[in-house]
């Protein structure tokens, strides 16, 4: 009888063990998320990351979901950053954290060829192991840099479900840098714990998502002007007819213009702009051959870097002088007031209420123009004073123009790596009755 009962007890033991593992797994997910994760068989075609603006700095940031159990981690949006980095010195707790050994496959993928030795702590912890990979990490605002530990952990991001925000999907071994804490102590908005790199690098967020989920190599950015509402970054093909996440805004997609997308030696995103027009007057800069740009002759501006870590557009001095002079000449002289730093051209807000000059960036083709709205051009520097939101970068800028976050806000910007081009909505979103906040359904984000 005992021999006959043995298989039964064995079956019951296995069943109870499986039930326990299922309950444990479900309870861990329910502690960190309020909605179920999709099954492993689901394959998203579009991923969504909500983005917010910081009112005090004008920079943009996102809550990413990392670790086990999942936690929200606020990080700065760094369009040209090489990878995600977060500070791990304190309060980093995760059951799935790993630090790959030096010279491992993960290190090669991250272009890390130097071993990391931790001297900060007598005991090992996230960010502090020996014989791991060293990854140079920098604060994109202060330019401070230091070595972090290459690490991998779970990352989760929203998928889409029709025109709605869908459940989260996971990358189980997402590579990032566990960076020293001093990198987050200056220049960043309050409570920000790192930076999210979207640049042209092997382990940037886009490249890891493209590779892991098999997405089309394209991401779309829409930065909100308002700290109280979200913008978003979409990873995947927004033009795919099967992706109807922004079906209610198809007229915006029909208003896109494009120009070649270039990559600098440092992996930064560049776009080709042939001229700036102010009330149809073409602004032509003095050409500086030492600047990073395309060789199209003296009448072309060349490479324009797109950034999110400069709050305002920075112009090489030769361009800034001509641009501000032409702009000022199109506004009554009595409207001009003393400049408020960091800006060099400011006006009495009441005296320019009748309108300001039209400014357009002419793309690679003269028929393709990006019209910059008044809200993107002007900044309320102080009560009653409006300033042109462009900054003189001096004579030694690396690029002739570095587009800043303020000028990018409330614009749809598509980075299409498959076609090597960047796209902008030709007319401001508001001309279509849209904002970044209502272009996408970000409920439950």
Curated annotation (Swiss-Prot):
PTM note: Glycosylated on alpha chain.
Keywords per UniProt: Allergen, Disulfide bond, Glycoprotein, Secreted, Signal
Span of domain Peptidase A1: 60-425
Cellular compartment(s): Secreted, Extracellular space
GO biological process, one term: proteolysis
Annotated coiled-coil segments of the chain: none
GO molecular function (one): aspartic-type endopeptidase activity
Name of the protein in question: Gamma conglutin 2
Sites where a glycan is attached: 130
Function: Sulfur-rich seed storage protein that remains undegraded at germination.
SUPFAM superfamilies: Acid proteases (SSF50630)
Site residues by UniProt (Cleavage): 293-294
Biological classification of the source: Eukaryota, Viridiplantae, Streptophyta, Embryophyta, Tracheophyta
Cystines in this chain: 88-178, 102-115, 107-133, 118-128, 346-387
Miscellaneous: Capable of reducing glycaemia in mammals.
